[in-house]
Amino acid sequence: NMLLEYISECSNNGYQVFSHNQAPDGNFVSPTLIELNSIDEINEEKFGPILHVIKYKTDELEQILTALKNKQYGLTMGVHSRIESKADDIINKSIAGNTYINRDIVGAVVGSQPFGGTGLSGTGFKAGGPNYLLQFVDERSITKNTVAFGGNAEILNLED
């Protein structure tokens, strides 16, 4: 399993890995927390119960947000803050398709809350959103010059 290999690789490379009772056959991946030293140490999304944690100083937040944006992955972002203006600032600098503030980042229900990513995480169209079906349509415009047919309504409506 790719996720179990990734978790093992992180542990072998000296990262702090917190996990509980991984199944030996790879059919289940326990929720896992991996503490990274820098945002530069993660280069792709991990679709599984893995939470990466990066400690940073307050004055480094702008650099972190810029680095996240440059990764070009934008599925989901979670922000926990008691300072609403700080949360708003983070949201405005994010490219995430869905952002959750002071709550968990799971539980989007298609039909209730549009869900989808941007950049390398998706097309930007939201499953369950009002414009979702448009991505499957090829829009065409056809214009006929009826005067070229003589403008006669009877001739225009003739069947073969």
What are these regions (language model features)?
Residues N1-L4:
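Short beta-strand to alpha-helix junction loop
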